[in-house]
Amino acid sequence: MSNAITMGIFWHLIGAASAACFYAPFKKVKKWSWETMWSVGGIVSWIILPWAISALLLPDFWAYYSSFSLSTLLPVFLFGAMWGIGNINYGLTMRYLGMSMGIGIAIGITLIVGTLMTPIINGNFDVLINTEGGRMTLLGVLVALIGVGIVTRAGQLKERKMGIKAEEFNLKKGLVLAVMCGIFSAGMSFAMNAAKPMHEAAAALGVDPLYVALPSYVVIMGGGAIINLGFCFIRLAKVKDLSLKADFSLAKPLIIHNVLLSALGGLMWYLQFFFYAWGHARIPAQYDYISWMLHMSFYVLCGGIVGLVLKEWNNTGRRPVTVLSLGCVVIIVAANIVGIGMAN
């Protein structure tokens, strides 16, 4: 396995670790509605950071974006909006299926769709079937799915042991939402594929290869921001128990506390895709769709590890922790199989 591929896998791991930890600051926000908290964090992660970093990277910010036709920008934006819809469905999936089953189904579907649909759309799927390296990467995707399934099973054992149930368990509704979440969340993978002309243009301007994907986030995350912020603002305006004015009428120290924690959560959320871009840049071009598989499987891996570190698995017994550990090992094996496949 080449050093470039190894570093690509490593940066995807770092990005996934940030994704697994980003909600920790949000949990310490006090007396704010979820909608206000999510909006503040989202403004930081989807608008301020992508724009600020792109302004630093690009020699002429406005000239860069105005150089693209609508036919180039629109698919990137719409796939970003598609991914934003997946974000909204993610929370609803947890509500009706519970954390473990919801995450397992949603992540499993988005891993498959986001990884395999890209080469199909690009007409390169035959390379996966007809080459040794392609078959190895497909095997890695399958092993990753098995690992996600094992971690999901560990979560179910944990929830059963601790007596945790879904907020409003509804299998039929939950499965529909999980499938929708999985499909729509893959929009980020499709957006990155559609944004290749933007990456190439950034490279032509002398932007470091590690950073060429970052300017496209202005458009991708702009699409996601409209969906997420629109959802939050509509609820803040329509739901009687929610009030943006009330949330910002608290004591000034508490408002500052909440804003800073929400902004930190937004920063950590953004960093997952900052390092995703670094990892994506190191993956061989013919296997760039594997970035999504690495990100999603490492997200599950890091989520399990973070749970152990935070002692969320204490008092659950030996079996759930053993199953979780097995699932984490399988995901690590999957990443190595994919790495070997790309090297071939």
Swiss-Prot record:
One of its GO terms (cellular component) is plasma membrane. The chain crosses the membrane at residues 4-24, 38-58, 68-88, 101-121, 137-157, 175-195, 214-234, 259-279, 290-310, 323-343. One of its GO terms (molecular function) is symporter activity. It is a multi-pass membrane protein. It is found in: Cell inner membrane. The keyword Flavoprotein does not apply. Keywords: Cell inner membrane, Cell membrane, Membrane, Sugar transport, Symport, Transmembrane, Transmembrane helix, Transport. Coiled coil: none annotated. It holds the Pfam family RhaT. InterPro entries: L-rhamnose-proton_sym_RhaT. It catalyses: L-rhamnopyranose(in) + H(+)(in) = L-rhamnopyranose(out) + H(+)(out). Uptake of L-rhamnose across the cytoplasmic membrane with the concomitant transport of protons into the cell (symport system). NCBIfam families: PRK13499.1-1, PRK13499.1-3, RhaT. Belongs to the L-rhamnose transporter (TC 2.A.7.6) family. This is L-rhamnose-proton symporter. The lineage of its organism: Bacteria, Pseudomonadati, Pseudomonadota, Gammaproteobacteria, Enterobacterales.
